Amino acid sequence: MRIRVALITLALLATGCGDDEGGDAATNEAPDSTSASTTTAAPATTTTALPTTTTEEPPPPSTTVAPQPVLFNERGPWAVGIVTLDLGDRQADVYYPAIPEPDAQTEIFDSLSVFPAELQAFIPAELTGEFDTTAYRDALVANDEQAFPVVAYSHGFGGFRQAATFHTSHIASWGFVVVTTDHIERGIAAQATGTLGGGAENQDVLDVLNAFDALEAHPELGPVSDLDRVAITGHSAGGGTSARAAAEEVIDVYLSIAAGASERVTQKPAAVFIGETDAVVKPERSYGLFDQLDNAVVVNIAAGGHNSFTDSCVGIYELGGLSVLEALIGPEQVARAEDGCVPPAVEPELAYDVLNHYTVQFLIANFIDPAAAGPLVDVSDLITPLVDFRVTGNPFAAS
């Protein structure tokens, strides 16, 4: 039982840490202005010109000013609501632009709640965590007189639908409806109880499609969710879900976070995120996806790791790692859970900023307004260093 408890605790702090398939910033616009110019006539004079020789000065060399990026790492203009949808044997959370009550408080998520009740007593209290979702439970749905594009998020192996609230809520704040569902066949509860597997073939993709159906049927969210503009993203095994779901007609663009290539690569606009030191899904596996894409951007974060893209990474970083578990589960499993979440890894919040910036820019460019998204450029000097930033074709081709 000690081993099982340790494994459960490890999974809690490092959700999505492995898979077997790889699988208020504002747009800066110059204000309109008109500069008035005046011409003053000089008094008329008569002069006798002397012969002169004039040598023309060569024109000054032209200079090109690099385009200034628009940053999306800060929260967008919308407050965010959260609603939970019942999908039968599993649930999905929806983050959406909202109008909260003046005295409303954002929802705090207790990660201990994702475990079966009979196991919760065995989880050490100091290793559990609470996360501010920065979203308001059941807040009034904003009506922007048009529907918002939809984004699906898929969690990793041993994960749960709330594994990356820093990301899902952030995307919604920029005017998107974000839906994230539990994949119970490979989720945290199944890992904790030893019941992994089962479900239909491609069950995780079916989970996403079923969540879209439930979203469309929701009386308040359905009318503001534009299922003609749809993206999917996912971390680790969820990145594999994203790549496979991209083959579905409903999906227009997709994103992959610390994941490898699927057996069949779909040619739609894509973004690929990599942690430089990821030892769980090694970078070459992620490059295996990017190298096959016609229209894509790849972003490789210096000193980033596999779990740099999850809520739990901050807690592990603040603890200084999980060395207290080595005696129970061994250094290899501890290293797997710590991947990207202990120094000298990049601070988790900086990895969050990079992921949030490029994700929102990619979505705005493809679904709303390419001009408002700004140029797609390396933000190493503005957020945190990247070891690789490359574009192939036109990642904004869906616009």
Q: What are these language model-derived features?
A:
Residues P60-V151, R336-A345:
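Domain-level recognition of soluble alpha/beta enzyme cores
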Residues G234-G238, S242:
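Gly/Ala-rich beta-loop-alpha elbow adjacent to hydrolase catalytic centers
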Residues A163, H167, G194-L227, I232, ...:
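Alpha/beta-hydrolase active-site loop
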Residues P67, P77, G88, S312-S399:
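Alpha/beta-hydrolase-fold serine-hydrolase catalytic core, especially in secreted/extracellular enzymes
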Residues L13-G16:
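C-terminal motif of bacterial Sec signal peptides marking the signal peptidase cleavage site
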Residues V272-I274, D278:
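Short beta-strand/loop motif that positions the catalytic acidic residue
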Residues T27-T64:
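Extracellular mucin-like PTS domains
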Residues T128-A190, A279-P283:
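Short substrate-entry loop that stabilizes the transition state in hydrolases
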